[in-house]
Regions:
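Short, flexible loop/hinge motifs at secondary-structure junctions
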Residues: 1-191, 263-264, 270, 321, ...
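Short, positively charged, Gly/Tyr-enriched micro-motifs
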Residues: 5, 15, 19, 142, ...
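Mobile genetic element proteins and their domesticated derivatives, centered on retroelements
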Residues: 59, 133-135, 172, 203, ...
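Gly/Pro-rich turn-and-neighbor structural signature
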Residues: 73, 116, 132-139, 210, ...
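Short helix/loop capping segments that flank catalytic or ligand/cofactor-binding pockets
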Residues: 143-146, 180-183, 271-273, 296-298, ...
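Structured ligand/cofactor/substrate-binding pocket environments in proteins
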Residues: 197-201, 209-212, 297-330, 472-479
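Conserved beta-strand -> loop -> alpha-helix junction used to position metal-binding or nucleic-acid-contacting
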Residues: 261-262, 323, 332-365
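Acidic/histidine-rich catalytic cores and adjacent linkers
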Residues: 316, 324-326, 362-527
Length: 527
């Protein structure tokens, strides 16, 4: 091969020019190739977002994978993610069917369950046919020797009536200077209103426990009973009840914060403000609760840090929440616990967006092992110390392996995709996720808290928005006690029917006696 310096000057210059042009072209191709890869990545991310939105709109709501995505992960311990991928890519006709699951034997039906014993029994006796009431031989009446009995659950339509309240007035002719004595006004939710306490309570229970909005209730009242009521009159009565309940909820919040463990979450609520024509302001209900116990909703007009900072001021203990930044730096005495359900949700969405990718189902299967440990603890009734010991033995090694696997996955995948986001979120929350391995009272996730949000979200779909900013704290007070009573298995009508009329005259320093937990302990026969 002739060296370049051996060529004539003119030829050498031409070759050098061609080499320079070729280098420029190669550089251009490299830049274009990088640009195409970047655009492909953008398209892939946008495609993921579109698929995720479609899935959220039209897909199933439960976080379950299809059998095709999970069967091979559980077929046997030695099955690897690569084998899952290869199996998924094979033509459908060539795929090896997963091992059949054994059918569960059908449980023996115990028979019809009896209706609740506490319900009133109204007997309806059906007589025999007259021809069967007399003896065919002698004609004498045949005595009743028993009954063929069965029970049905009956009901009566709601009955409305007008209560005429007459307070006695007494005077004396022989001693006129005694004046006239009048019976005192009994305590009421709305002292001078035309709605009885039991009517207000019924509307409240239907709206906030059964999610039946006021306008539907009033429409049914007008159609079925011919009673027309102004909606504002009724909603004002509900807000009056909410205002009365606020001190009780403040006392319940004090009970909650005296503990060492609080779960926190937030959800949106539209608020009418009049500031923007045709648009509502987005307010927030912040939930503070304990698993299986007290629930306190705090209304705020925004999602900023000020809300949780004010509520949790002075609290010392563990706060379990998601990765929202507003929860950070709430105080030096607060330990933050993470939520594994939020981590799981990211990998679930990644699995739905890329059904052939074996990595998300693999991670979900590992997370499932952690939840299986929690189910064992729940089913066997372990206390906090016993549950912590079980977690150390069973869950600790799984968590260590899970973190190592997430780190390895993150190094293998490009940035920006849903799987990348899921890995980054999990690893960013890892120190908080491990808190449940250090305290047996802390749950593996925030699902108790999220569960309390669901009734509120369902009700919000029916009553649409709050009528004003001032209504927010009152509705929050009602929702707090409704959800707390549900968790405590406390009869809401009995509880509110007892405390609401008394609250107007109840001493402020004794409000703590009316919280659901205290009231339940004092009224065990009513529950």
């Amino acid at each position: 091969m002739i060296a370049l310096d051996q060529l004539p000057a003119g030829v050498r210059q031409a070759v050098e020019a061609l080499q320079a042009a070729n280098a420029r072209l190669e550089n251009t191709v490299l830049v274009k190739d990088q640009d195409l890869r970047r655009k492909d990545q953008i398209i892939q991310l946008q495609d993921e977002k579109i698929r995720l939105l479609n899935f959220q709109l039209w897909g199933p709501k439960g976080e379950k994978l299809s059998a095709a995505q999970t069967a091979w992960l559980f077929a046997e311990a030695s099955v690897t993610a690569g084998e899952v991928q290869r199996e998924a890519e094979r033509p459908e006709a060539e795929k090896t069917p997963p091992p059949p699951r054994a059918k569960k034997p059908r449980a023996h039906h115990p028979g019809r369950e009896p209706l609740p014993a506490h319900l009133e029994r109204r007997e309806i006796i059906i007589p025999c046919h007259p021809a069967d009431c007399r003896c065919r031989q002698c004609g004498a009446e045949r005595p009743v020797i028993g009954y063929e009995t069965r029970e049905e659950l009956g009901c009566e339509p709601a009955t409305f009536f007008v209560k005429v309240i007459k307070r006695e007035k007494r005077g004396s002719h022989c001693l006129p200077e005694q004046g006239v004595a009048t019976a005192p006004v009994p305590p009421r939710i709305v002292p001078k209103g035309k709605l009885a306490d039991e009517f207000i309570l019924e509307v409240l229970v239907q709206k906030y426990q059964q999610h039946n909005p006021v306008y539907r209730q009033l429409a049914a009242l007008a159609e079925n009973h011919g009673v027309e009521l102004d909606r504002k009159t009724v909603t004002d009565a509900l807000l009056a009840a909410g205002e009365l309940l606020r001190p009780v909820v403040r006392a319940q919040a004090a009970e909650l914060l005296r503990g060492h463990y609080v779960q926190v979450d937030e959800t949106t609520v539209p608020v009418q403000t009049g500031e923007k024509t045709g648009r509502n302001h987005q307010g927030y209900f912040w939930e503070y609760s304990e698993p299986g116990g007290r629930v306190v909703f705090d209304f705020q007009m925004g999602r900023g840090r000020a809300g949780p900072a004010a509520f949790l001021k002075g609290f010392r203990g563990t706060v379990q929440c998601d990765g929202y930044a507003a929860y950070d730096d709430l105080g030096p005495d607060i330990t933050f616990a993470g939520c594994l359900a939020h981590v799981r949700r990211g990998f679930f969405e990644a699995a739905k967006l890329a059904p052939l990718n074996p990595v998300p189902p693999e991670i979900l299967a590992t997370i499932g092992r952690l939840y299986a440990v929690e189910e064992t603890a729940r089913r066997t009734g372990l206390d906090a110390a016993q549950r912590l010991a079980l977690r150390h033995k069973e869950s600790g090694p799984v968590m260590t392996a899970l973190k190592d696997r997430l780190v390895a996955i993150r190094q293998e995948i490009p940035p920006g995709g849903k799987l990348t986001q899921a890995c980054d979120y999990a690893l960013g929350q890892w120190s908080r996720l491990e808190v449940y391995l250090q305290d047996g009272a802390v749950e593996i996730d925030n699902n108790w808290c999220e569960g309390a949000m669901r009734p509120l979200a369902l009700g919000r779909k029916n009553w649409l928005h709050l009528g004003s900013e001032q209504a927010g704290p009152k509705v929050a007070a009602i929702a707090s006690l409704v959800e707390t009573c549900r968790r405590l298995d406390l009869n809401l009508r009995a509880y509110l029917g007892d405390i609401l009329p008394q609250l107007g005259d109840w001493p402020v320093n004794r409000v703590a006696e009316l919280t659901p937990t205290v009231w339940k302990a004092a009224h065990k026969k009513v529950i």
